[in-house]
Each structure stands twice: as C-alpha cells, then as structure tokens.
Design a protein with these regions (language model features):
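Intrinsically disordered, compositionally biased charged tails
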Residues: 1-4
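Phosphate-interaction motifs
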Residues: 6-114, 131-132
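Residues at secondary-structure transition points
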Residues: 80-83, 145, 149
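Conserved, well-structured core segments that form or line functional sites
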Residues: 110-125, 130-131, 136, 140-144, ...
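Conserved small/polar residues in nucleotide/adenosyl-binding loops
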Residues: 151-153
Length: 153
C-alpha cells in the first residue's frame, strides 16, 4: 500500500489532521488520533514489537514523544494490567499504520480510546522509518505534535 492509499484509508475515518514539527522547522505530516491537542517533548524511538502500553507508562519515557517503529501497534488493545506504573509518563505517541481493532480477550479499550482517556496526543500515518533515521542522526531532537482538527495542511 502506498502513502496516498494509506492516507485515504485514515482520512475516511475522519481523524483530525496532525503534524510533527521540529525546532529546525522540519515537518512530518500525519493523521491525528488519541487526545486532541498539542504537546512538546524530546522525540525518541522505540523498536519493540509489543508492550506499547507498558512503554507509554514507563517513567524512563517521561516528557518524551515516542515514535514506535513497529508498524502494527494497537492490535491487542489495552487493559488495566499491562502498565509499568500508575501514571502515564509519555507526552505523545507516533505510529506508522492506522490502529486496528483489538484482537485479544484481555482488551478493555482500543489503543485510540486509551490514548484519549490518558490525554496522550498521537499521530499515525507517518513514515516512522524515515523519522527514526532523522532522530538517530539528530540525537533525540525536541519536537511538537498537534492533532487539533483546526489544522489544515
């Protein structure tokens, strides 16, 4: 599936448009999800295939925006047991592919619902490999993500 097709799929679900902007004015465009808002933090990446809920609640990611490199994040949903702490530490989350419906008997919420409940601003539909290379080369730069529906790109 090419980028144009992927964006058409995400747009048909009417998520607000979103962007990631770095201090050096480099912009990545995506589709917003999770809590509608704007947040700023150090942008890092995580290459794990699983444990996205634990990663978002891990204190070592305090005040960071996490770029998840694995393309299928969210397919097992979320629950109340898979947390690293009682508090959500991450400021934002970035995903490659549209979040799918959960397929796990333990799922209580979709990842999108859980992000909204915990006020985590998210983006999907970004080229996370390109973003990871940028982060690797720049050393976890400061960035801002916004998925307010008022943004027109």
């Amino acid at each position: 599936m090419n980028k144009k097709q992927k964006n058409k799929i995400a747009i048909k679900h009417q998520f607000p448009t979103g962007i990631l902007v770095f201090d050096n004015k480099i912009v990545f465009k995506g589709i917003g999800l999770g809590h509608q808002g704007t947040t700023t933090g150090e942008v890092c990446f995580n290459t794990s295939l699983t444990r996205y809920q634990e990663i978002i609640s891990d204190p070592s990611y305090a005040s960071q925006i996490i770029n998840f490199t694995f393309p299928h994040i969210g397919n097992v949903g979320t629950n109340n047991e898979d947390l690293e702490s009682d508090k959500i530490w991450t400021r934002g989350a970035i995903f490659n592919s549209e979040i799918t419906s959960p397929s796990n008997y333990r799922a209580l919420k979709t990842l999108d619902e859980w992000l909204k409940k915990n006020k985590i601003v998210g983006l999907t539909g970004l080229d996370t490999r390109s973003l990871t290379n940028f982060i690797r080369d720049k050393g976890a730069p400061k960035g801002t993500i916004s998925n307010l529906s008022l943004i027109h790109i």
